[in-house]
Amino acid sequence: MWVTRLLPVLLLQHVLLHLLLLPIAIPYAEGQKKRRNTLHEFKRSAKTTLIKEDPLLKIKTKKMNTADQCANRCIRNKGLPFTCKAFVFDKARKRCLWFPFNSMSSGVKKEFGHEFDLYENKDYIRNCIIGKGGSYKGTVSITKSGIKCQPWNSMIPHEHSFLPSSYRGKDLQENYCRNPRGEEGGPWCFTSNPEVRYEVCDIPQCSEVECMTCNGESYRGPMDHTETGKICQRWDHQTPHRHKFLPERYPDKGFDDNYCRNPDGKPRPWCYTLDPDTPWEYCAIKMCAHSTMNDTDLPMQTTECIQGQGEGYRGTINTIWNGIPCQRWDSQYPHQHDITPENFKCKDLRENYCRNPDGAESPWCFTTDPNIRVGYCSQIPKCDVSSGQDCYRGNGKNYMGSLSKTRSGLTCSMWDKNMEDLHRHIFWEPDATKLNKNYCRNPDDDAHGPWCYTGNPLIPWDYCPISRCEGDTTPTIVNLDHPVISCAKTKQLRVVNGIPTRTNVGWMVSLKYRNKHICGGSLIKESWILTARQCFPSRNKDLKDYEAWLGIHDVHGRGDEKRKQVLNVTQLVYGPEGSDLVLLKLARPAILDDFVSTIDLPNYGCTIPEKTTCSVYGWGYTGLINSDGLLRVAHLYIMGNEKCSQYHQGKVTLNESEICAGAENIVSGPCEGDYGGPLVCEQHKMRMVLGVIVPGRGCAIPNRPGIFVRVAYYAKWIHKIILTYKAPQL
């Protein structure tokens, strides 16, 4: 017996009303389409419009401010006398043109138009289905067994109730296969055979159609949802998830619409999702039957030298730059990782050879030293260094070659369009006769070689991939007489045998990755941190998982809650080639107070006298099993490069970009966790960051002084970045 039969009528009405008013929890997968930005449902073709050759085809146009507004009206067919399948946004006139056709329709042709962007509803151009195929609106009209479909508005030979007027929005047009009720089996139709009432159509799943080679770095297909069915976020949008993978910043990564891609060396393609609680997920793309890469997809393979970033290096070097042996790729000791031969099948992760599977700056490996997780194999020479116009001498101020791309692959912009910016940071009139077209040049006497403007607001300028000519010994710093101090940050390196410090070190930064301390750093300006490149081995790293903690003494922030400042990192600027430096742009400026301050940079090219006592700071490995997590300081003295080389038994030759410091008697020095942190010296009552801690041979080894990046050598580059990188960074 039903309980409702026993209820008085008024009580029953009250219960029903209460049930109707209860909030309905819609699962994300079902509700996301209504909430998401409708532009995700369109495929964009830049600088393209559609021209109708059939005069009977209709067009609707109206002035609107954005493509998003055009998309909303197209999806809802609001105020349109037809079913909208595509639209064009006129960027110059801020006008929408809606079409009942698309580029696949007869009587229509594509045409180039610089001010136009064409957006086509994916449901009408997709030749595969997602899930049950409820959104499929393609033109297949034959069943799985080959029978022609019956038109939906016809009752011959089969009568039915699936009339187009009864299923608005389901596009029951012509005799195309559809799934208006979202039933199992996928799109179907009534057949033209009187003996067969209906049958499913043979339309494949998109996950079956799409395939990839290797790890999918070269995948450029239209998969736009994750393996759990979540719709991907457009790469040119910053909601619901902010990210750095902007199409204009990475023009070679194929960031079209919201399609799955693999820009950062993950095991397979992925995307950000429209679910606010799920930042990203992998996509379900199978391996191609013959999983071989085209010649155009393969990096140039070399065995004796590296080309570009060394992604094609297949040699047998198996130590990092300072001689520490590499850990085997198929081993999880001493360092656990997921960059295994199984996950990166095409990257030749054999033995313990140096490789670059993830698009880092150069080949690298995990090391066999438990205190040093990764290291670069920078001792591998570059390929094709010649003595002609492909290289430069000195600092490259006389380079007159025709290269017009930056080291990150961006095309250089014309010099004559950037003269105002150039005048802003140099104090003399540049030689305009040398500034040809958009060729790499060095008009400001940059110590680190030719460069160019890019036209990209996120990367205003960058160095060009040109090496110094072989055998060139021209010094890049002419005068080395000025007092110097440098500042830097490091990766997980810890000051061994240091003492706890409560002195004024408000410029010390703890860099966190997912709340775990990985490196130190120095606050050199309110919005800028100096640290080590080894803390960010991949240029394509997503920065949203990184934070900078300032004003703390305890690495976990215990007892520092009132003075602690936690800031997001929005941009990573790599230093000149071989510098091991990185500048981090903060999402907002740090607030300077009694606990947070900046530290000074040294003068460019300066030196500091030998035996000057300096200090290194860090939260890294301490030599103790149970670390207290407190900031430590170790006092070292400056040592001349020649003497430093002797302590290293002649195995290390220091150059003008390095500085050496060691402890007098006890075993003190930086270790993993301290990387990126500063070597701080005082001169003329001014404290400066003279060096940056980078990985070395071992950790606080007796009679083995530390080698630091010499900040004074890169001081002009640091000032140039701070002056020119003014645009908001994402």
Curated annotation (Swiss-Prot):
InterPro entries: Hepatocyte_GF, HGF/MST1, Kringle, Kringle-like, Kringle_CS, Kringle_sf, Pan_app, Peptidase_S1_PA. The modification Pyrrolidone carboxylic acid is found at Q32. Glycans are attached at N294, N568, N655. Disulfide bonds join C70-C96, C74-C84, C128-C206, C149-C189, C177-C201, C211-C288, C232-C271, C260-C283, C305-C383, C326-C365, C354-C377, C391-C469, C412-C452, C440-C464, C487-C606, C519-C535, C614-C681, C644-C660, C671-C699. The keyword Hydrolase does not apply. Residues 128-206, 211-288, 305-383, 391-469 form the Kringle domain. Residues 37-123 form the PAN domain. Residues 495-723 form the Peptidase S1 domain. GO terms for biological process: hepatocyte growth factor receptor signaling pathway; negative regulation of apoptotic process; proteolysis. The single-chain precursor undergoes proteolytic processing by TMPRSS13 resulting in an active two-chain form. The single-chain precursor undergoes proteolytic processing by HGFAC resulting in an active two-chain form. Keywords: Disulfide bond, Glycoprotein, Growth factor, Kringle, Pyrrolidone carboxylic acid, Repeat, Serine protease homolog, Signal. GO terms for molecular function: growth factor activity; signaling receptor binding. One of its GO terms (cellular component) is extracellular space. Residues 1-31 form the signal peptide. Belongs to the peptidase S1 family. Plasminogen subfamily. Dimer of an alpha chain and a beta chain linked by a disulfide bond. Interacts with SRPX2; the interaction increases HGF mitogenic activity. Potent mitogen for mature parenchymal hepatocyte cells, seems to be a hepatotrophic factor, and acts as a growth factor for a broad spectrum of tissues and cell types. Activating ligand for the receptor tyrosine kinase MET by binding to it and promoting its dimerization. Activates MAPK signaling following TMPRSS13 cleavage and activation. This is Hepatocyte growth factor. The lineage of its organism: Eukaryota, Metazoa, Chordata, Craniata, Vertebrata.
